[in-house]
Amino acid sequence: MCTAATYKTKDFYFGRTLDYEFSYGDQITITPRNYPFSFRHAGTKQTHYAIIGMAHVAGDYPLYYDAINEKGVGMAGLNFVGNAAYANVKPDVTNVAQFEFIPWILSQCASVTEVRELLAHMNLTNTPFSEQFPLAQLHWIISDETASITVESTADGLHIYDNPVGVLTNNPPFPQQMFQLNNYMHLSPKQPVNTFADDLTLTAYSRGMGALGLPGDLSSASRFARVAFTKMNSISGDSEAESISQFFHILGSVDQQRGCCEVTEGKYEITLYTSCCNATKGIYYYTTYENHQISAVDMHRENLDGTTLICYPVIQGEQVHFQN
């Protein structure tokens, strides 16, 4: 289970939590402009936009979980188990394997408008990366500073939805996630007034009662509602420090703690990492379950005209700042 969100102050921010019971050994990975992308069915791109994100690198290929490109477009894949379905290769369209969807989009799109144009002629195929890495059942959020969309490939085809909240979790399908927000239309950051009955004297006895009824469990539908409410009522200053701090607080509203979500006997899902990308400046910030200090990699401090992947290991272990 995972949660992705967008946030806009002076700059545009994009990020996600990755919630799972173990890590594949992920790295912050920069794909420079001249790294050759050899797509399974869509030819080779010798030059393209530079990309930075979290990936598992297998056979010198970046299997991105979430990433941004140098033009400010962000994209993340989130679990969509039981609903995701991919097609066989088809004629007269661009066939893109599921595992290469993120680099295929981010390598060539400078806006969500351009993404939509590509998706109109694309078929997402069931081609696996390898026998060791079978197909992942995912759906995706793709965003720039002006728009967000959700892309879902199901048994009845490829669907592209406007995403007005700039949030995505997992199941159910996105239209149902949006519809369930109707259940929470009464929520407010303001203190409630008595509309229960004119004949009763009812008063708010605690701060925060305007959000009474906001779900607090770890299910994907509840996380969608909670992070949407938090994000859409969120206020911060425009500085970089204020913006990234607020973004981590937004996604912190759906953090998963070890012991609260048992997936098999003795195995627990946790928030392995939380990312916050300044998509305007090309900076990838992150924290991990074991390290709450914010770490960062700036793509523009690297040679973006190179031909080989640039990888940074995830920093683990709490970084405690003693004051005495």
Segments from the language model and where they lie:
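A contiguous strand-loop segment
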Residues: 1-93, 121, 126, 311-315, ...
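C-terminus-biased signal that marks the final domain/tail of proteins
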Residues: 1-13, 118, 127-130, 135-136, ...
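Short acidic-glycine loop/turn motifs at beta-strand connectors
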Residues: 8-11, 69-71, 143-147, 152-157, ...
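Beta-strand residues in well-ordered beta-sheet regions across diverse protein folds
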Residues: 15, 76-77, 151-152, 161, ...
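Short, surface-exposed beta-strand-loop junctions and turns on beta-sheet-rich folds
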Residues: 20-22, 81-83, 156-159, 166, ...
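Proteins synthesized as precursors that undergo proteolytic processing into mature forms
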Residues: 92-128, 240-248
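Catalytic cofactor-binding cores of redox enzymes
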Residues: 121-159
